[in-house]
Amino acid sequence: GRQFFGTGFPFLTFSNVFNNWFLPKQLESLVQTTDKERESCSIKAGDVFITRTSETMDELGMSSVALRDYPNATYNGFTKRLRPITDRVYPRYIGYYLRTPKFRGQFMAFSTMTTRASLANNDLLNMEVELPPMEIQHRIATILSRYDSLIEN
């Protein structure tokens, strides 16, 4: 319940994921969590978070990528964590790629709509991700990061 929120350890909210291609530098929300929860729901550099439920289909599957470790932090239950098990994924590249219309279109094909849009775990596992060689991923991410910096400043 609500009594667990407001104090404790950093907490990744649904809106943190929904509104940011990359996790914010600081997670402002706090929640009381156990050692076990902090271990099983940890946030490490390279982790990809995807919103798995939403009010509408077009808001489903929004992603955000952790560019650093967040010690003692946990994430919300309406978000799915994907932890790449390969060194073939450059976090900045995947952060941009997962927000492209081409990739996001796959969510529409897999999602189901009852009263809320939702994604099943198996659907996420069946989605295709284009991974060019690491050097190309770095170049793409660097170019897009520079544009982001120009837009923000």
Task: Annotate each PLM feature.
Residues 13-14, 37-99:
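A short beta-sheet element
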Residues 97-129:
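Specificity-determining recognition surfaces
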Residues 53, 101-102, 147-152:
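A generic secondary-structure signal for well-formed alpha-helical elements
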Residues 32-35, 80-84, 125-131:
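Short, well-ordered beta-strand elements within core beta-sheets of diverse protein domains
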Residues 1-13, 120, 130:
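Extended boundary segments
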Residues 90, 94, 123-153:
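Amphipathic alpha-helical segments
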Residues 1-2, 15-48:
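Sequence-specific dsDNA recognition surfaces
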Residues 2, 69-70, 115-119:
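Short proline/glycine-enriched turn/loop segments at secondary-structure junctions
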